[in-house]
A protein has these predicted regions:
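Active-site-flanking segments in enzyme catalytic domains
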Residues: 1-154
Length: 154
């Protein structure tokens, strides 16, 4: 669903209980992120599977390594008690969705209004992470999705 999401203070939302993905019509760039939340949920919490562990570890390591170079204001937010602190970014479902975005934007080089990562630090640069993301998401989107009765996603 495309709609105005002003009161939610988010450009996109995924509601698992309603099986509904909502994207703010004024800012469609969160679509791919929310799409990967939906895939994660609909296919049985893929982000919690053992096969996703290496990506989780690489993401956190890369994030922490790059965090050292961030401004004090951003570090303060990440270390604070706001909704968008480091615990938020380290939730496995968030890592899954962000790595799905990495797959589309960095690996496949997709350029679209439906995918524009907004917080650069939330998408850490790492060759090892990119390679793990490439391997995992290629398998997911070309082999596993068709096995669930869904068409290939790429």
């Amino acid at each position: 669903r495309y709609r105005k999401l002003g009161k939610h203070k988010a450009s996109g939302l995924y509601y698992p209980t309603l099986h509904t993905l909502c994207v703010d019509i004024r800012s469609p760039s969160s679509f791919i992120h929310e799409y990967f939340h939906m895939i994660d949920d609909q296919l049985g919490d893929l982000s919690l599977e053992v096969s996703f562990n290496p990506i989780t570890v690489l993401y956190k390591e890369s994030f922490l390594r790059q965090m050292e170079q961030l401004s004090d204001a951003v570090k303060s937010t990440l270390n604070g008690k706001s909704k968008y602190n480091i615990q938020y970014f380290f939730r496995r479902a968030e890592i899954f969705a962000r790595c799905g975005e990495i797959y589309f934007s960095r690996i496949l080089k997709v350029e679209s209004s439906l995918i524009k990562p907004d917080l650069a630090y939330a998408y850490p640069e790492s060759e090892a992470l990119d390679e793990a993301v490439k391997t995992y998401f290629e398998m997911l989107l070309t082999v596993r999705l068709p096995n669930y009765g869904l068409p290939e996603a790429v």
